[in-house]
Amino acid sequence: YKQKYIPYGEKKPYVILEDSNQIEYRIYDDMENVFIKDFLPTDDLAFDMNMHILSFEPGGCHPFVETHVQEHGMYILTGEGMYLLDDTWMGIKKDDFVWFGAYCPQCAYGVGREPFAYIYSKDCNRDVTI
């Protein structure tokens, strides 16, 4: 992840030390079979990026195909899933790493018998400089 921090006025980010096992999952996008853990506050504009764990129960999926202006990557923590990158579906599993280019259409769903979970980084709270 290579990006210089982009300040927001006088707000300053601060150090957060947490164990991912101590962070509670919350329901993602009103779906009862997809859950998210946020490592940084999602409501504090001092932070220009975040780290999350997204976990899909078997059959759980993104609610739509999405794209992002930023590049980002993900590391698969558990299970297996199918992931759409551009126009290709590919199987991914625990210990795989995936890098997404900007504007690459993407979505996922969990397959198998255990949750499909991955950790990922993502820019947030800043407009893209054009």
What would you call each of these model-derived segments?
Residues 1-49, 130:
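A short, N-terminal "cap"/entry segment at the start of jelly-roll beta-barrel domains
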Residues 31, 44-48, 68, 92, ...:
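A generic fold-level signal
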